[in-house]
Structure formats: structure tokens, C-alpha cells
Amino acid sequence: MALPIKFHEHLQLPNAGIRVPNITFSNVTMESDKNIVVREMIGDQQQVVIIDLADTANPTRRPISADSVIMHPTAKILALKSGKTLQIFNIELKAKVKAHQNVEDVVYWKWISEKTIALVSDTAVYHWSIEGDAAPVKMFDRHQSLAGTQIINYRADAENKWLVLIGISAKDSRVVGSMQLYSTERKVSQPIEGHAACFVRFKVDGNQNPSNLFCFSVKTDNGGKLHVIEVGTPAAGNTPFQKKNVDVPYTADTAGDFPVSMQVSAKQGIIYLVTKQGYVHLYDVESGTRIYSNRISTDTVFVTCEYTATGGIMGINRKGQVLSVSIDEANLVPFVTNQLQNPDLALKLAVRCDLPGAEELFVRKFNLLFSNGQFGESAKVAASAPQGILRTPATIQKFQQCPSTGPGPSPLLQYFGILLDQGKLNKYETLELCRPVLAQGRKELITKWLNDQKLECCEELGDLIKPHDVNTALSVYLRGNVPHKVVQSFAETGQFDKIVMYAKRVGFQPDYLFQLRQILRNSNPDHGAKFAQLLVSESENGEPLADLSQIIDCFMEVQAVQPCTSFLLEVLKGDKPEEGHLQTRLLEMNLLAAPAVADAILANKMFSHYDRAAIGQLCEKAGLLQRALEHFTDLYDIKRTVVHTHLLKPDWLVGYFGSLSVEDSVECLKAMLTQNIRQNLQVVVQIASKYHEQLGADKLIEMFENHKSYEGLFYFLGSIVNFSQDPEVHFKYIQAATRTGQIKEVERICRESQCYDAERVKNFLKEAKLNDQLPLIIVCDRHNMVHDLVLYLYRNQLQKYIEVFVQKVNAARLPIVVGALLDVDCSEDAIKQLIINTRGKFDIDELVEEVEKRNRLKLLNHWLESKIQEGATDAATHNAMAKIYIDSNNNPERFLKENPYYDSKVVGKYCEKRDPHYAFLSYERGQCDAELINVCNENSLFKNLARYLVKRRDFTLWEQVLNEENVHRRQLIDQVVQTALSETQDPEDISVTVKAFMAADLPNELIELLEKIVLDNSAFSEHRNLQNLLILTAMRADRTRVMEYIQKLDNYDAPDIANIAITSELYEEAFAIFKKFDVNSSAINVLIENVNNLDRAYEFAEKCNQSDVWASLAKAQLQQNLVKEAVDSFIKADDPGAYMEVVNKCSQTEHWEDLVRYLQMARKKSRESYIETELVFALAKTGRLTELEEFIAGPNHAQIGQIGDRCFDNGMFDSAKILFNNVSNFAKLSVTLVRLGEYQGAVDAARKANSTKTWKQVCFSCVENGEFRLAQMCGLHIVVHADELEELINFYQDRGHFEELIALLEAALGLERAHMGMFTELAILYSKYKPEKMREHLELFWSRVNIPKVLRAAEQAHLWSELVFLYDKYEEYDNAALTMMQHPTESWREQHFKEVIAKVANVELYYKAMQFYLDYKPLLLNDLLTVLSPRLDHSRTVLFFNKLKQIPLVKPYLRQVQNLNNKAINEALNQLLIDEEDHAGLRSSIEAQDNFDNITLAQQLEKHPLVEFRRISAYLFKGNNRWKQSIELCKKDKLYKDAMEYAAESRNGELAEELLSFFLDEKLYDCFAASLYHCYDLLHPDVIMELAWKHKIMDYAMPYMIQVMRDYQTRLEKLERSEHERKEEKAEQQQNNGMTMEPQLMLTYGAPAPQMTYPGTTGGYGGQPAYGQPGQPGYNAPGFM
């Protein structure tokens, strides 16, 4: 019986590059059957692998740092979790969708819909929407029953009203499932024991709405159960679902199995339940009936999802196989019917899933109900039958023929009503329903049914509706895909825009040009443009649906220029070269009909591939000069047109010149000036201004000058001068402006331009002799020609312009002007007056310099005094006055001290050579440090310099003067120490000076300075910092004086100074400081750490007798390995603080007794665990086992287990035994007892420990010491762990204990936890050491061994029989067959071989098997071929035996398979029969099978010595229409009867007449008469009469002639009778003409079949209508088009 399920392997994850260790529940997720996501570690980098199940060959890898990844069920969206950080990322958009930082760790998460992720923490469950920015929403708290469980699943119903959380945990050697069912409406939870669950919306028979069902399965000690219950309140009108509670079978071998996942197909109503050990169970939701169970995987299936393609389930097992299970639609119903003997369930499944297999049941039920008059029920059965098996014309005919049973609707109407309620009608049902409805005029019903998708649309239905409603018919044609009728209907309804779109969509090609012409003639031309546009825009492969030129012709036929223009503008917007002729045509039609439109088109520059020359000429004729110029390329044409500037836009014309060459542009400009300079000058200037860079300014200037147009030159140059750097342009502009009287512009350009030649312009302006000299003044002022300017103006009597220059133009030039006037001997009074009158700003220093150079400084005295009196505070004025006072010795010292405005540097510099004292005063007043130091050094003013430095308090200045390169440093230091510091009382002065000496690294001078301050009883003697500095400086400069200062001084920082002394290696001085200030702990540290004298330290400690001193000494002694002395010192210090160091040192030096003393003291002070732990170990080390036992028996904080380990590691097994026993560490105790040789005790301890590692250690030790009985006891606890089995076996085998190992495994097979590895390894051991036992072992336990592994072992051991057995069980039939053929003496068994060979996949093995049988078992060869015949290539098989010349051996096989009508078989068998001269068999063969070369065989048999074979040859010729050849052969062998029969069969009169002639020639008159009978209808009576008369055998021909006369008579009588009947019918028809033959149709009457015709109608689409019926348009009827 075929299985009711389909099992398919989609993928193996290892083949996609996934390593098997990564295939785990935590690393692999599958949220849907679209994608699989795997987290994988590659080296040090973690990656996520995304496998698209639609494209498994191309997995996507991305680096990640997340610890969990789940993929969106349908979209390319990843959810990633790293710790408490959650993130959603869109892979396609490469963008982060959402992120959240969770408060709790998420232990499980899952997509429960396309928009929601469920998050499960240790305490609660949350829902997180991927839409918006909202954080996860808490749904409910976890129930306490799920505490400590591993969450494996979470499910929600369709409306998220019911939620269930599922977890598992280990309890009492089994896996317990815990579930929490939660209602979001009632906010309550219910704990349930269960392992797998899901929700489903399922519609129960009789209910209007689906029920919300909750399905879950549980495995307990009492067995497995599946529960199906309804949750929530049933929908209104629904009958509550009856709870189902059914058993889930678990065998003894699967006692540890339990459900892991569940999926329910809502459409099929089937539950798919998968268990841990790979079993799948199928249940019907409605009845709870178990449909099928089987094992689909030997490995655990740890993740599943719904397989949407078939409604089944998809899962992944530990090996990485991606498997799916679905129902087999072809076999499910037969399986339920025959195997389960449940026809009711089979019917339900067939209806629910629309499955085949129950046709007979439905037909029987329908016929029974129909025969009983239950038409309503039978209609329901017919409507619900799967795959429409009862929805046939025969069923409709049945309902049409049955009478109406009462006032209600007729059976046919009931049937159609049920069909409409359940779904869509088929084509025949639609037509039968719509005919009477349309006849009654109720087309709204049809419209309603069409909108509800209840009718199957077809051409016939559209034709039926079209006379009543064209739009509805169009809808039907569209839905029924009848393109030619759709296009026709669109045209009739004016929906032209839809024609192209529809035709393209369905691939139909209508006559578009015809449709376009119809639109242009009968409709708005604009619609034609739109339609034409569609013909182009909806093109395929870049080609329009109609030729563009022909489309344009269509427009031109009706003179539709504007619509055609609109169309072409849209079509040609791509501006392609191949469209040039169309562009030309577009422009031509508009230039002739609408020049403005053409102008707009050209203005937008839409086209570039038209005939420019032709269009240019047309533009000129149309008055579009601008467009004509754009198209002209000949200079003559351009010059002819361009001079008409009044007809051209200036802006455009300027832009146009940009497209001309330089030479052409200049020529055109000249032509424009020559034609009409007044009219064209302005535009010429504009053009020249814009293109001067390209045309060349020199050429343009020359052009204007040649036409003597200085005005044009002025305007041209004025437009470019501000941007030009050409000196010539600027000069020409100044010239043009001067000549046109534009003096203000001359002033501006002279003032602003940077490019003209100043000398050339100055000379031009002098020669021009302008009335206004301001341009000349500006040029000379800007270019420093003021001296020349003053000379020119003074000599030309233009003094007023000198005053204008300094007073209005540039007052800053006054000093130069004064100097120039002095040079020309101008009077002092005039100069003074000029200075006084000049109110602008000028440089007084420069003025003073100019006057001073000419020894006329006193000239400024009164002017300067007046300025000071006016309140002038500028430095220049006061500097000049200071110089005058110093030179005149007019009380300068007072001026220098009191005047705040002069520049100290300037005046000081002026005084240096005249009086250094005045220079010092000036520099001091301005803090000019560098100048002051320099003047003091040069003039030995060190005392003044020292006072200045102390008061200045500037470190930079001190650094400069105290530099060792300063030759005057010593003199300055002496003045600082002797004079400057003695005079000051400001501590800040002292501080800065001392710091400066320190920074200058002058320790000796600093000591000298500090002694002066500190030791000479000054005001700063008790200053702490100064005392510190003195001692520190002495440490650095003179160490011999340090002890003296320590003793003399008391107000210094002793700890800091002592520490510095230590770093300076002044240990005695540091010790003296600590001792002086009673810091004894630090003092002894100096003796210990620096002086390194423990004896002095010990003496010092005895003197002090302080705990901290003793502790410091003890630590030092400990570091020097003086352990006993250190312990004594620690005890004197009574300090347990250093117990860590003491323990480490005593342990290193083996001073365990001293350690005991110290730790006993320390224990009194502190009950630290470490102290007591080390005391225990020290007692163990000293062998004080009694004290040890007493200590650990009492209260303590020691780490007994840790000490036990240390004792064990150090070989102190007696102590370890005591300690391990104390803490009940039986695992370690057992190993310790093994070391002590107490094996029985070790086994007992191991039993208490119950640890695999312990069992291994004890077992191995027992094996090593020959205690095999105890070793076996231990081994039984090891072998049940598959991971440990290999190590155990290797240990035994390496030591040669094979018998004991086999005994151990044999004893272990009966254990409850026996697993596959044990059976496998025992089989391998049997193959190596006891091959005689292997067969029995495999026959008993083949299903529990790892067959591939045992296969290798059996092959290596040459156990061929066992190898075949395993290959058979493993379904490797190819290898099994090969092995039997290679080793037949040991492994071949006839029946077994035939069973195996029929299952092999490799067809080549069939032929190897044939050869094998030929070699070893030739008599059984036909039996083998019988078995293989369903799968053999019979042609190849025949060829195989032909090559070996063994065809006779396989004759039975050939007989058996001849019914296949294979050519090779037929020819081989026929040849064999020929060889055997079996003509009867050959005749039978060729009559039964015709697939062979008939002609070749006929030709072969034609020459055969036996007549029967030649007769067969004639038969074959006849069968191949070689009648003549066949008859000739019969005549040759005198087979006259055959010849007559063949001549009759040939239907050839000539052959028949030839045969008659042959008989007459041979005087075979009887055969002649017989031939007349056989060939009666082929012969001509006149020919026969002639032959008979010639040969005088009329008697032989007379029977033939009598029969001919009778036939002629009969035909005449029939013809007369037929004519008489035709006349009667015609008369009757004329008499009945005009009568109505049929009543109005009603729905209950039904409709005639499409092929039927009514009386008075002719049938067909083009026939005439019946009387009283409307005409139907047909293909041949008027009005169709």
C-alpha cells in the first residue's frame, strides 16, 4: 500500500558550508520555510549564514557580534540580540529599523507575526512591534511552574488573544514539559503539563465561523496524549467544539521520547506532531483520529515550521538535514479508506482537502440520494465532491430531467444555488444557468454573479450577453481572455486608450492603423493623438506598434496638424539620429501651417537631426530671421540677414555671435557698422563687450578707430576696462574718455585702475593740458611721482593744485611735498602756512625726518608746541619735542620722567650716545628690558640693573641675565646679594629671585643667597620653604653641610626631606631625621631597606619595642629567608597580617613546624578561611593526623576539599583519604582509595559519587591491576554514555583485554540506557575477534547499530555475508548486489539476490548481474530477467545477449516481454523463430506485435525455402501496402485464395482486373468466378462482360451480372422514394410557416445543449433566428463589425 505522506530532503546544511558542531538549537533558527539562519564561528570571527531555501546554492555570510539571530518570516529583515541589546536590521535597505536596550536578559525570542517579536525573559514575556518607536510591551509574568525550564517555543493564535509559553526540564530521569496558557482578554494564566502546542482556526462542519482551537501534546509516565480543545467563547451561531483527547503511541524502544514540536494545517485540518527521536504523527483535528505514524529521522529534530507549499511541516535535525513531511494527495484518501477502514474520515478529508481517491464513494452516495428523491442532499454531494468529479453535463441533465417536487425551487435551481453558495461555476454550468436568466431579462443577476466571481467567463458567455449589455460582455471577454472580442468591444464603446494596453498585456496584435483612422474620422482628433501616443509608448523592444510615417499619413489625411504636432513632440523627445526625417517633417508642416509653433519648437532646441539647410530657408521665407540665422552656415547668408538688427532680439543676437568663428564675427560686425552705424552701434558694442576675449580687444579697438567711432570705443572699453588687465585697454579708455569729455571717468579710472602704464598716462595728461589737473594729481599720487608733480605744478604756476593735493587729495603726502618745496627754495612762511592749513592725517615722524634731513627741525618747534597745547597725545609729536628738549638741554630729565606719551624706545635710542642715564630713565619707564640691559652692561650700571631685576620679578629676564654666557653675571649677582635683596622687604621679591637662581642652576650662589637670608637672623629666618630649600640645595651642591643644617634647623618638612635624602642616598641623614622626629617605623625601614643592616635593625627594634617596628623587621627577615627569626619577630609583633607571605615562604623552604606555630598564633587573631586551610595542610605535612582529625572534626572555616586535592597531588593519600571522607567527596575518595590499593572501597565510593569521570578512573585502574570483575562493574556505568564509549574500548584494546571488553559490552546490552554506540562497537569487536557471533548479533540488533560504521568493519574483516546483510538493511542495494557478485560462494543467495537486484538504483548493475548469471547460474537467467523486466532497457538487453550469442537462452524472457512491442525484442524473437523454422509462432508474433522492420523481414522471408515463410512474406508486403508485390508472390506460390483476398483489401480496381486476367490466362475459371465475388465492388460490369464474352465463359460471370442488375434496381427505387418525401416535407413547412413554436423560457426548464437546434432555426452563429426571437449577431450576420 502506498504511503499517505511525502517525505523530502531539501538540503543538508553541511553541504552549504555549515559545520556540524554549529547545528544546535541555540545557533540555528528557522522562523519560516523561506530562510534558515545559522550563527557560526570561523576562526576568531563570528558570522551569520543566511540560507534562502529558494536558492540554497548561494548562502549569504555576514560578520556579526550577536549571540542570537532570527529572520523575519517573509522579508529580508534580521533581528539580532547581543546581551541585553536588541536590534532589527533591514538587509535589503542596509538600514537599522529599530533598536532597544532591554533591562532583563532575553532567554528566548521568536517572530509570532510579520510585525511582532515575542521576547521571553526569566520573569516575563514581552511583545515588541517593529513599527514605530515603542519599546517592548509586557504581556504577562512567567508562571512559577516554568521556573528553571528551558524555553523551547512560544505560540500565539491568529488574533493574539491567546498565548502559550512552552518549556522543558529534567525531572526523575525524564523530560517534563511545562506550558503556560494566557488569555490577553481575561489577563489570567493557566499552567499545563505539555511539551508541544499550537493554535489553529478550524471550521467544523455545520458551523458558519471557524473555531479557535488549542492543540497540545504531553508525554508522561503513563504514555502520550494529544488534546484538542476550543479556547475562548464560541462565535455566535457556532456549535462548541467537542474536546478531543487521544493517545500518542510510544513503544518500549521510544520510552524516552517526547514531543518537541507541532504544526497544524488549517486548510487540511491535519496535526503534524514531531517527537525528539524523529517520529512524526498525523492526526485529524476534527475527530482526533490518528492517520499515520512513522520515523522520519534517526537524529533529533530540534526546530520546525510550517511548510506553506503543501501545508505540511518542515524541520532540521542534528545532522543538518532540512526535511519536510506533507500529505500525499494521491494516496491519502485510499490509505484512510483501505488501511484505516475509515470511509467517513476519507470522505471528510477528500472534501476538505479536495483530494482524489474517493470518487467511487461520492458517485455511489450521489446516486443513492438522487434515486431516493433527496435532490437537495444529492445536490450538496455533487457540489462538494472533490475535484469536481460530479460537476458534469450529465449531472445537470439529470437535474433538468427530474420533475419539480412542490412549490419550492426546482431541483436544478437548488443545485445551481448550492454551487453558487460554495464557489464558482464551471463553463458548462455557467452557460446553462445564464441562458434562461437572460431570456427572462434579469441581466442584473449575471452582473452580481460576475462581481462575486461566481461564473467562469468564456467567449460563448460573452456572445450570449452582448446583445443585452455590451459593457458586461466586455467584462466577460476580459475575464475569459478573448482578445479579438475585447478589442472589438473597446472600439464599439469608444475606449480606444485601453486597446493598446490590453493587446500588449495579452500578446494580441490588432490592426492599429485602421483603429487610428476610425478615431480621426469619427471622433476628436485629440483622441487620435492620444491613441497614436499609446501606439508608440507601449512599444516592445523599442519598436512602435505601427510605423510612424504611416501614423503621420493618417493625421495628414484629415489635415490634423495640431494633434499630429502634439503626438510627434512627445514621440520625438528622445532626439535620436534615426528620427531625423520625422523631425524635418514635423518642422516643415508647422513652418507652412503654423510658423509660431515651429518657432517655439526651434526655440526649445528639442531636435538636432533634421535637415538644417532646408529648414533654414523655410524659416527665412516665413520671416523667422532669428531661426534662419541659427540654421545658416554660409557667411554670405549670415551677413545678408544679420544686418537687419531691428528685426532681431538684441539679447539673442549677442548670444548668436558666440556660435560664429572669430573671423566671421569680425566681418559681421564690420558689415553692421558699415550698413548703419547709428542703428547698429549699440548692439555692436554689446557684442564686442561680450566676446572681446575671443575676438581680441586690439582688433575691436582698431575696428572702432577705423570707423572713427570714439563714442563706440568709449562704451566698448568702458564695459571691459573694469575686468581687463591689459594696459593698452586702460590707456585707450583714458584717451577715449578724454576725447569724449568724460573727465570724471578719467579721474575714476586713474584712481581705481591697477593696469595702466603710469609714466605714459602722466605724459599724456601733461600734453593734454586739461583745465582740471586732478587726474594728473591722482596718477602721480598713486605711483609715487609726488616730487615730480610738485615740481611740475610749482614751475607752471599751479600752486593752488599743490594745496588741493595735500588738503583734499592725500594729506599723507605732506612730508614729501614739504621736502620738495624746501628743495625748490620755497619760503618758510609759505611752508609753515601749508602745514598749518593741512588738517588731514599725515605721518609726523616722516615730516620730522624730512625736515631733520635738511637741518630745519626748529622749523616745527612752534607748530609742535601748539599741537601739545591743543591736547595732542600721539607719540610722534612728543618724540619730536623730546628730541628738541634734549638737543637744547631744556630740563630733559623732568620731561623723560613725567611725560607719559613719548615712545621710550625711540627716545632711549636717541639718548644712548648723548647721555646713558637719560637712556636708562627712558627704557625703565617703558620696560624696554633688552635695551635697558644692553645700556647697563655697556655703561656698568649693575646696581641699577640689580634693583630693576628684583622689582621687575620677570623669570624670562632673570634667565637672560643669569645665563652663563653673560660676561657680566658675577658683577650682577654680587649687586643682587649685597644691595638689592638687602633693600627689599617684599617676600614676593625674595621668592622670585630664589626661583630664578634655582632655574639658572646656580646651587653655590643660591646657598650663598639663602644663608644670607636664613642664617643672618633676617625677617625670613624661620621661613619653612627657605629652610627646606637650603637643605635640599646643600644635598645637591655640598653634602658635607647637610647634617649640619639638619641639626641647626628645626622648621623644615622632616618626612619629605628624609625621603629626598633617601633618594639621594643620604641614608644616615635620613635615619637621623626620622630618629630626631620619632618616626621609628620609617627609621627601621631605612636600616633595613637602605643600610641593609639587620643587626642594627634588630637592636633598634629591641630599644623601641613597638609592634610595627617588629613587624617591619619580621618582613625583612622573611625576605632574607630567615624564616625562624621572622616567625619569632611576627609572634613578638603579634601581627597575623602577613599570613599569605609567611605561608608561601614556609611552603617554599619546608618550615612546616614554624608555619604551624605562626598559624596557631594567627588563628587566635583571625578566623580567616585561608589561615585555617593552610593550618590543616601544615598539620598534614607534619604528619599530625590525630590533630588533623580533631581539627576538622571541630568547627572550622578550612577548605577541606581543596586541601584534600593538594594532599592527593603531593602523594599524601592517607591525609587525602581523611579529608575527602570528611567532605563526602566520593569521586576523589574513590581515586584516592585506588592509589592506596583499596579497589573494593574505591568501587563503593564511585557508586556513591555516580560520576562518569570517577567510574572511568576506577575502571581503568582496576583494568591496569587485573581487577576485571570490578572493572566490569564500573564499565557498565560508563558504556551508557556514548561520548565515553570509544575511550573505554580503546583502553581495553590497547592492553589486549578483548574477551573482557566483549563480556562487558554483552552485559551492557540489557541495560535500560543501552544506545546505538554499544551495539555498534560490539558488532565491530565481533568482526575482529569473534566473527562467528556477528551474524546473530546483526540479525537481532541491526536496527540499533550504526550501519555505515559496521559496514566498514565487516568489509575489513572480509565478512561478506554479513556485509550483504547490512547493505540490504541500509538500503544500499547497489553495494549489496555488487558484493554478492564479487563473493558469490559466501554471500550469494538466489532469492535474496533477486530481491536486492530489483531495488538497485544503478542500471549498469543489471547487466553485470546478467553476466554473473551467465558465468555461474545460466539456468536461472530467465528468472533474473523476469524480476528485472519492469526496469530493463530491453533494446540494450537484447543487444547484450546478441553480442554474447545467447539469444536462444533467453527465449522465455523474450516471450514474456514481447507484449511491450519493442522493436529489438520483436526482431530478436522473430529471427529466433525463423532459425527454429517455427512459421506458426512467427505468424502469431508478427500479427500480435508490429514494431519491427516489416520490409526487411518480408524481403528476408521472400527467399525462404519453406512456402509458409514465403506466405508470411506476402502477408507482410500486403500489410505495408505493397499489394502488387504481395499478389505476385501469392501467384508465384499458387496461393490463389490469398491473392484474391489481398486484391479485395487493396481497394484497387486495376490490381483486381490484372488478377482476373491472370486467372483467365491460366484458364483458372473457378478462381475467376471466386474473384468476382471477392472483388465485387472494385470491378466494372462492362469490363467483366467483355472478358467473359472473349473467353466464352459467360456462365462463370452470370452470378456477378445478376447481382449488379439487382443493385441498380434498388438504387433507383430509393431515389424515387426520397424525392417524394422531400416534396411532402416542403409542402408541410409552407403550411406551418408563421407559427410560434416555443414558450418563454423559465429557469426550471433548463436550456438546450449548445449543438441542438429548434424547429425553424438553422443553428450556428450566423443562422436566421426563430420566429419571435431576437437576432443574434454571428460571424456571417450583418452588423457584426
Curated annotation (Swiss-Prot):
Protein purpose: Clathrin is the major protein of the polyhedral coat of coated pits and vesicles. May play a role in yolk protein clatherin-mediated endocytosis by oocytes during oogenesis.
Residues covered by region (WD40-like repeat 2): 66-105
GO molecular function: clathrin light chain binding; structural molecule activity
Residue ranges of the region described as WD40-like repeat 3: 106-147
Gene: chc-1
Lineage: Eukaryota, Metazoa, Ecdysozoa, Nematoda, Chromadorea
Name of this chain's protein: Probable clathrin heavy chain 1
WD40-like repeat 6: annotated span: 256-299
BP GO terms, sorted: apical protein localization; cortical actin cytoskeleton organization; determination of adult lifespan; embryo development ending in birth or egg hatching; intracellular protein transport; positive regulation of clathrin-dependent endocytosis; protein localization; receptor-mediated endocytosis
Composition bias type Basic and acidic residues, residue spans: 1616-1628
Source organism: Caenorhabditis elegans
Region (WD40-like repeat 4): 148-193
Cellular localization per UniProt: Cytoplasmic vesicle membrane; Membrane, Coated pit
Residue numbers spanned by region WD40-like repeat 5: 194-255
Top-level taxon of the source organism: Eukaryota
GO CC annotations, alphabetized: apical plasma membrane; cell cortex; clathrin coat of coated pit; clathrin coat of trans-Golgi network vesicle; clathrin complex; clathrin-coated endocytic vesicle; cytoplasm; cytoplasmic side of plasma membrane
